[in-house]
Amino acid sequence: MANQRIRIRLKSFDHRLIDQSAQEIVDTAKRTGAQVCGPVPLPTRIERFNVLTSPHVNKDARDQYEIRTHKRMLDIVQPTDKTVDALMKLDLAAGVDVQIALG
């Protein structure tokens, strides 16, 4: 797999979980002899919701909620066949969304 790159994007609502998963990927890639760039923290997406607490009047009384989506990106440069096999067998946490792109 000469002159190839694997780009991995991770998304999660919990920053501790995403950092732990990124560290597992980095350790696995380095153990199999590939170079790793990252993890690079990407901007956190913050969604805010305002909900009226009263069912009828009192528009001033509201609850505010937010969801933070944390993102990380890793580049694995010059992956070996062992690296690809190890990444396929890697078991990550359920709360982490993984997107893999070959380039």
Swiss-Prot record:
GO terms for molecular function: structural constituent of ribosome; tRNA binding. InterPro entries: Ribosomal_uS10 (IPR001848), Ribosomal_uS10_CS (IPR018268), Ribosomal_uS10_dom (IPR027486), Ribosomal_uS10_dom_sf (IPR036838). Keywords: Ribonucleoprotein, Ribosomal protein. It comes from the Bacteria. It holds the Pfam family Ribosomal_S10. One of its GO terms (biological process) is translation. Coiled coil: none annotated. SUPFAM superfamilies: Ribosomal protein S10. Gene3D superfamilies: Ribosomal protein S10 domain (3.30.70.600). GO terms for cellular component: ribonucleoprotein complex; ribosome. The keyword Ribonucleoprotein applies. The keyword Ribonucleoprotein applies. PANTHER family: 30S RIBOSOMAL PROTEIN S10 FAMILY MEMBER. Involved in the binding of tRNA to the ribosomes. Belongs to the universal ribosomal protein uS10 family. Part of the 30S ribosomal subunit. This is Small ribosomal subunit protein uS10. It comes from Psychrobacter sp. (strain PRwf-1). The lineage of its organism: Bacteria, Pseudomonadati, Pseudomonadota, Gammaproteobacteria, Moraxellales. The gene is rpsJ.
